[in-house]
A protein has these predicted regions:
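Sec-dependent signal peptide recognition
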Residues: 1-9
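A residue-level marker of the well-folded mature domains of exported/periplasmic proteins
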Residues: 17-218
């Protein structure tokens, strides 16, 4: 997370410095001499995203002279409306930048289009926004994150090597419309095909551990 934080902040600061600062609005971002960056996460009940938020806060604490940081997120990863509301709140607050891990690759694009129209720098992390939807809104939002497809392929190769050639495989994915979920499913299916095995069921757990456990034990 440290390397990602440095990259994100470098991109944001360079962009924000070139923005027009002639506005006399009394918003959050204008009240400070340094840019205000909003980190909009998925579920902060998920340890993975809590660790990401902690890493960002640690970086800001070490570089407090460069920027301010506002961290927020949703509790349930399927609560897309709440994450849209958070983006709109950040727009109203007048932040200079929004770094977002979108809960959905499509549903967040209209809200982020409003942010860009307001002159806010937007950076996409973790779950990539759907390129086709971005094109519809004439948006170019940079993405910083891993290749979920390659990662899932590697995981599949490792897991399947211990199974018989005629094994049947079940896939339990996250939110079906999320880009990272699609990429992970695709990568794992490639591993299954390469191992000459068959996927017999595909179900969505919506990134919910309780739901995933219920589906697995059913």
């Amino acid at each position: 997370m440290k390397i990602i934080s440095i990259t994100l902040v470098s991109v944001i600061l360079l962009t924000a410095c070139g923005a027009d600062d002639s506005s006399d609005s009394s918003t959050l971002g204008d009240a400070a001499a340094k840019p205000m960056i909003a980190l909009v996460m998925k579920s902060l009940a998920n340890e993975f995203f809590v660790n990401m938020a902690n890493g960002a806060e640690a970086h800001q604490a070490e570089h407090g002279e460069q920027y301010e940081l506002l961290v927020n997120g949703i509790r349930n990863e399927s609560d897309l409306a709440q994450q849209v509301n958070l983006v709109d709140q950040m727009i109203s607050s007048g932040v200079q930048a929004i770094v977002i891990a979108p809960a959905d690759s499509r549903a967040l694009v209209p809200a982020l289009a409003r942010a860009v129209a307001a002159g806010i720098v937007v950076i996409n992390i973790d779950n990539r926004l759907e390129p086709e939807i971005l094109e519809e809104y004439n948006l170019q939002i940079p993405f910083i994150g891993p290749s979920n497809r390659e990662g899932a392929k590697l995981v599949g190769d490792y897991v399947l090597q211990g199974l018989d050639d005629d094994s049947e495989v079940a896939i339990l994915e996250g939110i079906s419309s999320a880009f990272n979920s699609i990429q992970r499913r695709t990568g794992f299916e490639e591993a299954v095909a390469q191992a000459n095995m068959q996927v017999v069921t595909l179900q969505s757990g919506d990134w919910d551990q309780t739901k995933a456990a219920q589906l697995t034990s059913a």
